[in-house]
């Protein structure tokens, strides 16, 4: 990627990746732990690259229109849901803000609940 001239990258992975593995419920680890581990490897690679990177770890993804109520968190346990549209909008903001380079964020929406 660096050889192609790419300078900025937003990587969207998931809750449970990297240092948030400890917060992933046992049931979720059993269901998709392997995929989370692979995403964690991608995060590790990116963190060692020369790119200006930002990592975004969404909670459980849900279809639907953006609520505008999604919140970002760093270094705190997060669970729940978030709309894909909110992840996209927030990701764009993070990508265009140079101050977020080298940072990892979780994103969830406290206004959403499982039916």
Where are these regions (language model features)?
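Oxidoreductase cofactor-interface core, primarily capturing Rossmann-like NAD(P)-dependent enzymes
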Residues: 3-115
